Amino acid sequence: MEKPTQLTKSIGFFYVAKDNEAKTSELSLLLSQKKAILIRAQWPSVPFLSVMDNVSLANKKGGDLEDVLPYVQLPLSALKKDRTELTPFEELKIQLLLALLSERETLLIENVLSTLTTKEVQTLLPLCQEIAEQFAVAIYLIHEDECFAHTPYTTYL
């Protein structure tokens, strides 16, 4: 029997301190139950496939790619780039795209902010808030810097 969790019913963009063992443990449980998807600084793509092929491979539910791309602010041309040409921010957006196409209700973003510029972080936070509202998902930003807990875009847990 699966252990119930309050986090599975949440919708919004939440900050979780990396050292909050209770919440991170609960989120790890969601990952192990395949109820959540993890977004990392390094996109774990299949190395010998193109970016577009990686996206197509991960899009098992057959969601309409072009409908979701505007929500992650990613042009179709980014999917035609070589994997080595992608910026860390583009990799992050591709992972957000894949998470939305997978139709999971919970997305975990862990330790990615240090790979982004200040401007990219300023773009990412409202973007995640908007995605959470538009797709009725819970997005958890797991990070050690609590300054992200006090933005107008996140709810601190």
Task: For the regions a language model picked out, list residue spans one by one.
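Glycine-rich P-loop/Walker A and Walker A-like loops and their local beta1-loop-alpha1 context
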Residues: 1-36, 113
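ABC family nucleotide-binding domain
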Residues: 19-23, 62, 84-85
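Q-loop/switch helix immediately C-terminal to the Walker
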Residues: 41-74, 82, 95
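Walker B catalytic motif
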Residues: 82, 108-117
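Conserved ABC ATPase signature
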Residues: 82-90
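GG-anchored amphipathic helix commonly corresponding to the ABC/SMC/Rad50 NBD signature/C-loop
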Residues: 89-108
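Conserved catalytic loops of ABC-family nucleotide-binding domains
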Residues: 103-105, 117-149
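A short helix-turn-beta junction within AAA+ P-loop NTPase domains corresponding to the substrate/partner-engaging
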Residues: 151-157
